[in-house]
């Protein structure tokens, strides 16, 4: 193969790879951005040693994505304090870099995050942090959804969960359940699902903490 041919092949590969990277970047949805940031926050804190550089990068990603508060009504399970647990919020994650005692005032950060942004904004990712006791199940109701919604959950470090999801139409009262596979029933650190309906509906999410310790969980909706 001549040098000229090799050069042409190299140029073609360069533009092909660049094009693929551009397509991938363009297809990253706001939901995926927030979902992945929550996962990376846990990765940065895994093993008990926080990576300051990673945490700052995650904090910036969440700040730029600007998720708004997710309106959630807890209908089953104990309502626990977030004290001592991870809050999936850019200010809390940034504070983790320099302040090891930040977990003691986790509830304060969670409350402030729920006041940030306009809850009525359309086409925005919604995010909240919830607690589930070890081995217990909490059920949450997310109202006023329409069309196709993407829902995700990310457990804090060293936690796993299973979940059940169903939608209930406001007008027809019809229910649709989204089945979990075996791996989900045994417990996973994160999970996502798409749900849809031809009418306005609410989403019922039941999260079972499969861990032996209480845990915080990010609930994400888009």
State each model region's role:
Residues 64-141:
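Non-catalytic extracellular/lumenal accessory regions of secreted precursors
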Residues 1-8:
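Positively charged n-region of N-terminal signal peptides that target proteins for export
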Residues 32, 130-214:
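Acidic, Ser/Thr/Pro-rich low-complexity intrinsically disordered segments
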């Amino acid at each position: 193969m001549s040098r000229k041919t090799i050069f042409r092949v190299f140029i073609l590969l360069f533009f092909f790879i660049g094009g693929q990277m551009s397509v991938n970047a363009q297809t990253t949805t706001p939901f995926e951005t927030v979902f992945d940031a929550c996962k990376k926050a846990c990765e940065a804190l895994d093993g008990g040693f926080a990576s300051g550089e990673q945490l700052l990068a995650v904090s910036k990603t969440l700040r730029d994505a600007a998720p708004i508060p997710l309106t959630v009504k807890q209908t089953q399970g104990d309502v626990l304090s977030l004290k001592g647990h991870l809050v999936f919020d850019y200010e809390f994650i940034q504070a983790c870099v320099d302040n090891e005692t930040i977990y003691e005032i986790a509830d304060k950060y969670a409350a402030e995050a729920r006041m940030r942004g306009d809850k009525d904004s359309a086409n925005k990712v919604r995010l909240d942090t919830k607690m589930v006791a070890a081995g217990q199940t909490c059920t949450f109701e997310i109202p006023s959804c329409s069309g196709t919604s993407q829902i995700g959950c990310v457990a804090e470090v060293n936690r796993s969960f299973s979940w059940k999801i169903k939608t209930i139409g406001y007008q027809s009262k019809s229910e649709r359940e989204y089945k979990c596979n075996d791996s989900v029933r045994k417990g996973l650190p994160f999970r996502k699902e798409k749900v849809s309906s031809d009418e306005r509906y609410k989403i019922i999410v039941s999260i079972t903490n499969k861990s032996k310790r209480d845990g915080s969980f990010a609930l994400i909706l888009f």
